[in-house]
């Protein structure tokens, strides 16, 4: 793949533009008025957001999408008139003769058929070499980039903060981005989750600052060179790419060398021993970290702590996010903010307002005394941390507003007073390779749940042949848990939950796949006037 990304005006074409990582990059390019094209197989709120700012999307992945870029303007118009999936009123051919104006440059394009007319093709690890568009890009001689190449190029344009780590990247990067936004620094933000404060997974600012989520899943983390790097933790994950923790550590060590400053959580022994960050943080007051906390109070609706900086008390920290892991994420934001010269009061004011990213302990609603929460946890450590946070809700009066992530302070419960008595975990394992590699750890990750329902593995493109299955996962969990149930399909999960959930339950959906799709339908059933708690034979 090519390494040099031209950000001066040449068109970009994203294969799989609707993905969470790809769409964030496409959004930044489109907002910078660079010609932005892409393909995907279905429309979503993410792709509609891109189209609204001028991105042009093909709803199929075919070689002819790229052939468009070698045609004359007249040929393009004919092609587009026969392609009803594109909005012709928005479409301006990117290879017409003349000048393409961008924010910083005026670039003169040569005659059609010239190599300068070919788009720069961006793909992710999910796109393989058999993809018809990818093959067409190779045959046409298009510059082809991994999405990490494009992110690396963007990072070089800014005073950048790149947040890496096995867990907590999205929350930490979005929290840092929100902090800079509240501080009036108008950052550019590129993350792997959606945040209401900027209406999606990316925003284009006007300042020199960029906050990016840095993904280690495929080894491409080594391409990123940030002014400030953050590492939240390091564990073995993505067994489809890594065979050992040592391989993961090597990637993070290269990342450290590429960053001018490294902020790291030394509660993780691997970060402490293998990376030795220049600026450290810890939620253990006995540690020798530069930033640490004491007087910690984990409550059902808030976390409180006193923050220390290099042996001196900074002051009180209050955050709406629950659990030890989120206190650690907030402390990372404190360390970054102080490194940037922000006043502690500015930092804490922002953290106190932050409501979290979507699908990170996201409150989806309450019906008939049942609270519904959506969470992205799909690794044993993430499940442990998330269920521990869920347990903080038990036996607490949630009145009048349950305090659970996004929109939590604007959604009132239907009941004047609601007490959580039971945590029900609904788990959709993600990838056969991960499930097989960590089956022993998954088996012991649900101790903080009162009931566990397991459904079929979300393959994420992996073959199921000869692989572990979810019934085996349920059996493994049942060795450590008394109430574990297996339901094969999402429909059967929904029907089962309708039978067993009751007032006082917190139903938490744990999935990086599509499990959360059943939440709206399930809530709608509970809102029907004839709803009553049913009993059934549980097996």
From Swiss-Prot:
Its EC number is 6.3.2.8. Pathway: Cell wall biogenesis; peptidoglycan biosynthesis. The keyword Ligase applies. GO terms for molecular function: ATP binding; UDP-N-acetylmuramate-L-alanine ligase activity. Disulfide bonds: none annotated. It is found in: Cytoplasm. ATP binds at residues 165-171. It holds the Pfam family Mur_ligase_C. GO terms for cellular component: cytoplasm. Keywords: ATP-binding, Cell cycle, Cell division, Cell shape, Cell wall biogenesis/degradation, Cytoplasm, Ligase, Nucleotide-binding, Peptidoglycan synthesis. One of its GO terms (biological process) is cell division. Its main location: cytoplasm. It catalyses: UDP-N-acetyl-alpha-D-muramate + L-alanine + ATP = UDP-N-acetyl-alpha-D-muramoyl-L-alanine + ADP + phosphate + H(+). Belongs to the MurCDEF family. Cell wall formation. This is UDP-N-acetylmuramate--L-alanine ligase. It comes from Trichodesmium erythraeum (strain IMS101). The gene is murC.
């Amino acid at each position: 793949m090519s390494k040099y990304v031209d950000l001066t005006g040449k068109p970009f074409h994203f294969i799989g533009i609707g993905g969470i990582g790809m769409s964030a990059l496409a959004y930044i390019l489109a907002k910078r008025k660079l010609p932005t094209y892409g393909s995907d197989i279905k429309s979503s709120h993410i792709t509609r957001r891109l189209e609204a700012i001028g991105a042009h999307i093909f709803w199929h992945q075919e070689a002819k999408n790229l052939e468009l870029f070698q045609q004359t303007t007249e040929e393009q118009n004919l092609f587009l008139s026969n392609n009803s999936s594109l909005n012709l009123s928005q479409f301006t051919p990117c290879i017409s003769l003349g000048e393409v104006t961008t924010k910083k440059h005026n670039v003169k394009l040569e005659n059609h058929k010239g190599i300068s007319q070919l788009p720069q093709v961006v793909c992710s690890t999910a796109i393989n070499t058999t993809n018809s568009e990818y093959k067409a890009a190779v045959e046409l001689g298009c510059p082809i980039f991994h999405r990490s190449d494009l992110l690396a190029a963007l990072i070089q344009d800014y005073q950048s903060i790149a947040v890496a780590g096995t867990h907590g990247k999205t929350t930490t990067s979005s929290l840092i981005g929100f902090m800079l936004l509240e501080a009036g620094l108008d950052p550019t933000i590129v993350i792997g989750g959606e945040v209401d404060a900027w209406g999606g997974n990316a925003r284009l600012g006007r300042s020199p600052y960029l906050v990016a989520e840095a993904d280690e899943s495929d080894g491409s983390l080594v391409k990123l060179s940030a002014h400030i790097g953050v590492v939240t933790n390091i564990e073995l994950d993505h067994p489809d790419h890594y065979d050992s923790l040592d391989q993961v550590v090597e990637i993070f060590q290269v990342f450290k060398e590429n960053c001018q400053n490294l902020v790291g959580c030394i509660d993780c022994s691997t970060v402490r021993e293998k990376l030795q960050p220049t600026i450290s943080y810890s939620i253990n007051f006995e540690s020798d970290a530069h930033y640490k906390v004491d007087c910690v109070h984990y409550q059902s609706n808030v976390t409180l702590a006193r923050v220390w900086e290099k042996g001196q008390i900074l002051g009180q920290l209050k955050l709406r996010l629950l659990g030890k892991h989120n206190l650690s994420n907030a402390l990372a934001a404190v360390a970054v903010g102080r490194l940037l010269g922000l006043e502690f009061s500015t930092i804490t004011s922002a953290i106190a307002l932050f409501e979290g990213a979507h699908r990170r302990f996201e409150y989806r609603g309450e019906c008939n005394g049942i609270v519904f929460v959506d969470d992205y946890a799909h690794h044993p450590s993430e499940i442990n941390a998330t269920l521990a946070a869920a347990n903080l809700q038990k036996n607490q009066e949630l009145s009048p507003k349950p305090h659970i992530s996004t929109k939590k302070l604007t959604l009132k419960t239907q009941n004047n007073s609601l007490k959580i008595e039971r945590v029900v975990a609904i788990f959709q394992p993600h990838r056969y390779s991960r499930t097989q590699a960590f089956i022993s750890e998954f088996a012991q990750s649900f101790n903080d749940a009162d009931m566990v329902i397991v459904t079929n593995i979300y393959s994420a493109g992996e073959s199921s042949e000869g692989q572990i299955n979810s019934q085996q996962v349920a059996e493994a969990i049942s060795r450590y848990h008394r109430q574990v149930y297996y339901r094969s399909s999402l429909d059967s999960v929904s029907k089962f939950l309708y039978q067993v959930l009751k007032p006082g339950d917190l139903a938490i959906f744990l999935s990086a796949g599509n499990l959360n799709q059943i939440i709206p339908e399930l809530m709608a059933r509970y809102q029907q006037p004839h709803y009553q708690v049913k009993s059934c034979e549980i097996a």
